[in-house]
């Protein structure tokens, strides 16, 4: 058999293998009334101090730098540490030496960690933040059976680009409004928005 014949015979197997490879996900940009409400309460003079539980990015930083000169990225989203590494990461999260953080971007961290970890996270945020700190969080209340880790990037004060960065995983039980308020205390929910996609966005303010 000629060499070209052998190549042709191998192509179906190559095509089959290629079909098993998950295609790269594309980012999806959406409006965010929760972020709009958060930023509307801030001043664009650089005085704020931001703790972002996600990752840094140029476009993301351009939006935040309108409001803050001091920004720390924890890197807990999209892939939070697990087990003892989670506890160590929380303990290692440093305070801002100049002034306590007064803005927290928590993204969908509450969907990504177990209930005991949620309590530890909020306790650490309370220790690191100013008395009137504001917090933004989003949870998936769609009831979907699976969810994917997401990387969120600010594209404006009222828009966010969301990129899936991992395979689907079984979704946790949706965190409903009343349990979420208990989880976040002493951050008190002041505004909540339900999106058509089933997401719920929350803005909360720390109370003494």
Indicate residue ranges for each PLM-predicted region:
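Class I (Rossmann-like) S-adenosyl-L-methionine-dependent methyltransferase catalytic domain
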Residues: 1-42, 57-94, 134-208
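A short His-aromatic
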Residues: 112
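Conserved beta-strand/loop positions that form the S-adenosyl-L-methionine
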Residues: 53
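Hydrophobic beta-strand segment of the Class I
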Residues: 104-105
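A short glycine-rich, Lys/Arg-flanked "PGG" loop and its adjoining helix->strand segment in the class I
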Residues: 119-134
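Hydrophobic adenine-recognition pocket in adenosine-nucleotide-binding enzymes
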Residues: 109
